[in-house]
Structures are given as structure tokens and as C-alpha cells.
């Protein structure tokens, strides 16, 4: 099932969040937005966290490197990493075509509600248009 960008929540730092409930627990799938991928251009490396790591909101969990810059990746949610997309670092070109489905980075079992600072799609688009 294709992920609809208009239904996701977004951090100011360009990570997207898709929350699903499974067996009474809430899980957040996290990736970086198509806007971020476009701005970084020519991705060459991505560092992923380990399964089992506990993340806090705003904590750096990895980085993505392009020919232009190295950018940290920040957790938009609090919880335990339960899965990482291990195929992603070897297929970064696919992020250009599919930042929202193939481009997921990690899945986190939430330990708290989503932060109120996460934006809906309209607010995120406004932020991106203002950033140019």
C-alpha cells in the first residue's frame, strides 16, 4: 500500500512520521521527505541506528551524506527502534523516486504520544516553500 504524503506528520528537520497501531501498541515509521532528498541531491551514504536503541524526541539517530553536505537525522518521536531499513544505504538512488515508501529509514515502538511540534502536510509544505 502506497504511503500518502498528505496523511503524514513532519518534523522541522524534514523527517516524516507514519503512525500505525499494531496489537494495541503504536509504531512510527520514519523517513526523510522528498523535499529533503531533493535539497541534499546525490546521496552517497546513510548511517542507520541499531535495533533496540531507545530514542528521545530530537535525538540524532544517524546521518545522510550527499556530495554537497552531511546532514544529521533526528528522531521526531520517542521510543525503541524495532526495525531499520537495511537495504536503504545500498539503494539511496531509490529515495529520489520513492522517499515515502521504499525510503522508510526506521520503525519505532512509541513510548509517548507524538510531539505537538510535528506539522501536518499543509504546514510542512508552507515551511518548504518559505525555505525555497
Swiss-Prot record:
Keywords: Lipoyl. Residues 27-109 form the Lipoyl-binding domain. It comes from the Bacteria. The keyword Transcription regulation does not apply. SUPFAM superfamilies: Single hybrid motif. CDD domains: GCS_H. Binds 1 lipoyl cofactor covalently. Signal peptide: none annotated. GO terms for biological process: glycine decarboxylation via glycine cleavage system. Its cofactor is (R)-lipoate. It holds the Pfam family GCV_H. InterPro entries: 2-oxoA_DH_lipoyl-BS, Biotin_lipoyl, GCV_H, GCV_H/Fam206, GCV_H_sub, Single_hybrid_motif. The modification N6-lipoyllysine is found at residue 68. One of its GO terms (cellular component) is glycine cleavage complex. The glycine cleavage system catalyzes the degradation of glycine. The H protein shuttles the methylamine group of glycine from the P protein to the T protein. HAMAP family: GcvH (MF_00272). The glycine cleavage system is composed of four proteins: P, T, L and H. Belongs to the GcvH family. This is Glycine cleavage system H protein.
Amino acid at each position: 500500500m502506497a504511503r500518502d504524503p498528505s496523511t503524514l506528520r513532519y518534523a522541522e528537520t524534514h523527517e516524516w512520521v507514519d503512525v500505525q497501531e499494531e496489537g494495541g501498541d503504536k509504531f512510527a515509521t520514519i523517513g526523510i521527505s522528498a523535499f529533503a532528498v531533493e535539497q541534499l541531491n546525490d546521496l552517497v551514504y546513510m548511517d542507520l541506528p541499531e535495533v533496540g536503541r531507545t530514542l528521545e524526541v530530537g535525538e540524532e539517530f544517524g546521518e545522510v551524506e550527499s556530495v554537497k553536505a552531511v546532514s544529521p537525522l533526528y528522531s521526531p518521536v520517542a521510543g525503541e527502534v524495532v526495525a531499520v531499513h537495511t537495504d536503504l544505504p545500498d539503494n539511496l538512488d531509490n529515495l529520489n523516486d520513492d522517499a515515502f515508501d521504499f525510503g522508510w529509514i526506521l520503525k519505532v515502538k512509541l513510548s509517548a504520544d507524538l510531539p505537538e511540534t510535528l506539522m501536518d502536510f499543509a504546514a510542512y509544505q508552507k515551511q518548504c516553500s518559505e525555505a525555497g
